[in-house]
Structure formats: structure tokens, C-alpha cells
């Protein structure tokens, strides 16, 4: 697992894939910049298709609403040999962490 603060540090690395496991509606309302939306409830169905395109040497960072779904998905992916991190506390902890002085500099996209 990683903290909300560490998410930005990992984002700067070359081979990082950030995956939002929330619903498409939640994703459209607010998501981490550059994150791919892969809803947790559809994860089993499309997991293999997505994983075909993600190199095992890359790092996947998963987040959800509060951190529980991303932790479960991370465990499954690690069993398959992928490098995976889960954001503790999910998007709510990240967006409420006051990591930036100005909303312009935030990696969170809010479409309201």
C-alpha cells in the first residue's frame, strides 16, 4: 500500500498505470489525472483484456472510494506476478489531504 502523499511521487515514474476502480459516474465527478477507469464490479470480466496491454515490469497503482476494493484487487494482481500498490484511504483521503496550495496544481480532476 501507499499513502495519498506517495501517489504523486509514483506518478512521476516512467512506467506507472493508475487505475480508478470506482463506478464510471464517480470517475467522471472526480478522478486522479491520467487514471484509467476500471470499475471493481467489472474487474473480473475485463481484467485479462486490460492486463494484456500492461507490461508486468510496470507498476499499477489502484485506488477506489475508501481503499478496500483496491486492496482486494491489488492482492489478486500480485498473485499473478504484477507489481501493484493500493492507495490507503482511497480517493477521499487523497482529495482531502491538502497536498497542494492551489486547485490548479492538483492532480485531481473535478468535473462538477
Residue ranges and their predicted role:
Residues 19:
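Active-site flanking residues adjacent to catalytic metal/cofactor-binding acidic residues
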Residues 1-10, 16, 24-59, 65-112:
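Rhodanese-like catalytic fold shared by cysteine-dependent sulfurtransferases
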Amino acid at each position: 500500500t501507499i499513502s495519498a502523499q506517495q501517489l504523486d511521487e509514483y506518478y512521476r515514474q516512467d512506467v506507472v498505470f493508475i487505475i480508478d476502480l470506482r463506478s464510471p459516474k464517480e470517475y467522471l465527478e472526480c478522478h486522479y489525472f491520467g487514471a484509467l477507469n476500471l470499475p471493481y464490479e467489472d474487474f473480473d470480466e475485463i481484467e485479462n483484456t486490460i492486463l494484456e496491454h500492461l507490461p508486468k515490469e510496470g507498476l499499477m497503482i489502484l485506488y477506489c472510494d475508501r481503499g478496500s476494493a483496491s486492496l482486494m484487487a491489488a492482492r489478486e494482481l500480485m498473485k499473478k506476478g504484477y507489481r501493484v500498490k493500493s492507495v490507503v484511504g482511497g480517493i477521499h483521503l487523497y482529495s482531502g489531504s491538502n497536498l497542494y496550495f492551489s486547485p490548479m496544481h492538483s492532480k485531481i480532476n473535478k468535473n462538477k
